[in-house]
Amino acid sequence: QIIEANLALRR
């Protein structure tokens, strides 16, 4: 549930 947020913020 952290890498998902990381990918979302990377966008």
Curated annotation (Swiss-Prot):
Look up the signal peptide feature and give its range.
none
Name of the featured protein: ATP synthase epsilon chain, chloroplastic
Q: What does this protein do?
A: Produces ATP from ADP in the presence of a proton gradient across the membrane.
Domain of life the protein comes from: Eukaryota
**Where found?**
Plastid, Chloroplast thylakoid membrane
Q: Which organism was this protein described from?
A: Populus euphratica (Euphrates poplar)
Quaternary structure per UniProt?
A: F-type ATPases have 2 components, CF(1) - the catalytic core - and CF(0) - the membrane proton channel. CF(1) has five subunits: alpha(3), beta(3), gamma(1), delta(1), epsilon(1). CF(0) has three main subunits: a, b and c.
Q: Which UniProt keywords apply?
A: ATP synthesis, CF(1), Chloroplast, Hydrogen ion transport, Ion transport, Membrane, Plastid, Thylakoid, Transport
Q: How does it sit in the membrane?
A: Peripheral membrane protein
Sorted alphabetically, the Gene Ontology cellular component annotations on this record are: chloroplast thylakoid membrane; proton-transporting ATP synthase complex
Q: Tell me the protein family, please.
A: Belongs to the ATPase epsilon chain family.
Q: Which GO terms describe its biological process?
A: ATP biosynthetic process; proton transmembrane transport
Kindly list the residue ranges recorded as spanning the membrane.
none
